[in-house]
C-alpha cells in the first residue's frame, strides 16, 4: 500500500514539474519514477524561488537559487547531470560561446565556467567568445575557474582552486594550480 501511495505522489509531482519545467530535463537517474529521488526533491525545492519569486524564471530546468547562469541556451549537458546546477555559488557564463558538459562530469561548489572576457583596451566591450568543453566523467574541484577556449578530455580531475587557462585534451590526468598544469596521469 505504501509503495502505491509513493507512486501516486511521484506521478503528481511529475505532472506538477512538467507544467513548470521542460520534460526533457526530467529524465535520467535523478528523476526515477519508482521512488522519490533527489531530482524530484530538488525540482520541488527550486520551484518556488525560481518560478514564483522569479529567480531565473526563464530557465527550463530546475536550478538552485545560488547558481548563476548567463544564456542557458548555450549550455549542453546530460539530464543525468542536472545536479551540477544545484552546486552552490557556481557561475556559468555562456554569452558568446557554448559550454559543453560531458556525461558524468561533476562540478563542485563555487566554480566558474566562462566563454568570453572583456577587451583589455576597452573594458566596456567583450572579446569574441570561445567554447568550453568538459569531457565525460571529469571532476572540477571547488573554487576552480575554467576560462574561454578550454577543452578537458575525458576523466580529467581539476584540483580545488585551480585556474584552467589552456586545454588538456588527452584526459585521464590530474591538473591543478594557477595557471593549471598537469600533476599526474591517471
PLM-predicted stretches and their roles:
Residues 109, 116-130, 134-136, 142-186:
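Glycine-rich hexapeptide-repeat left-handed beta-helix
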Residues 1-115, 120, 136, 154, ...:
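Domain-scale signature associated with acetyltransferase and cell-envelope carbohydrate enzymes
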